[in-house]
Amino acid sequence: VESVYELHSVSKFYDNVRALDVISLSIGTGEITGVIGRSGAGKTTLLKILAGLELPTAGKLLFKGDEIDRKSVRQLRRVATILFQTPLFLRGDVYTNVAYGLRIRNHSRESIGKMVVEALSLVRLDGFEDRDARRLSGGEQQRVALARALVLDPRVLLLDEPTSNLDRANASVMTEIIEEEGEKRCVVIATHDYEQIKKLADRTIFLEAGRIVEVGATDSIFSGPLLANMENVYTGVSRLVDGISHVDIGNGVEIKAAFSRPGRVVVHVSPEDIILSKGWVETSARNEFKGRITAVEDLGPIARLKIDTGKSFTVQITKRSLIDMGLNVDSEVYLSFKASSVELV
């Protein structure tokens, strides 16, 4: 894989806060790199540095072998595009928004028209040119923002939580597009959606408190001990009801958590904390969902199950329980867990 970025002992400070702490790595083209970690781990800061929106406080950033500094960073910005979780739009139609970057680069009107149509086709929004960009659904807006990035044919595409607030249909479309683009250019995704990373990323960078904990092939990262208990991580919007957080994680699934924090949150439920049954069971658990088993993984005395409830949950039970309950792929099951089992990430 051809190296695009090289970071040598890169650190980034905001006042006295160290957002990145002596990061050294290389990122190649023609592959998708995933960046994972808890909130505040430094994922977005890393993307901003790769996009040229921020410069390292210390260390060196190289792009195609050339060091990036205050003079050369403008050139990096022309070939690296970042897509944030909540995109901003100009007033007006979709065409105006997608064409904006081409206009300031002085493309002809004829070429702009052709390139906008092609970009909208790439994101499965054919015929959306005259639609009001600010009145589209969240999923459509995210795809318009992606079209606005792709129309510039960037060498590098940087994505910050690209599907966190999308429904399943739009998230699936975005995932397909990202997979296609990963074959053409350098793509880096920062996200809490571990299932998406496992599906898309060739390599994964695991950050914690601004430092690289592990970097390597995605399969190796997720089969290792560091991430064994980091399944069931969800981004959602929390509202407080009687002091309890009700977190909407999408697709009609709402998790009740024993903390009081409104707004956007990232939560984690350990697979071992989820109780599995073949029927409704009256317990003190505040979270109860009906689902269907989509996968069973044999881990010796333990079995790890994937259960689709509208959102995918990973549940870990003993092999004995799996056999005694007569469970297999496509079995209908019920899962429950306490509000106190839901942790902020």
List each language-model region with its residue ranges:
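Helix-to-loop junction immediately C-terminal to a conserved catalytic motif
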Residues: 51
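Conserved signature/switch motifs of ABC ATPase nucleotide-binding domains
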Residues: 131-134, 152-153, 183
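Catalytic Walker B motif of ABC-type/P-loop ATPase nucleotide-binding domains
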Residues: 157-161
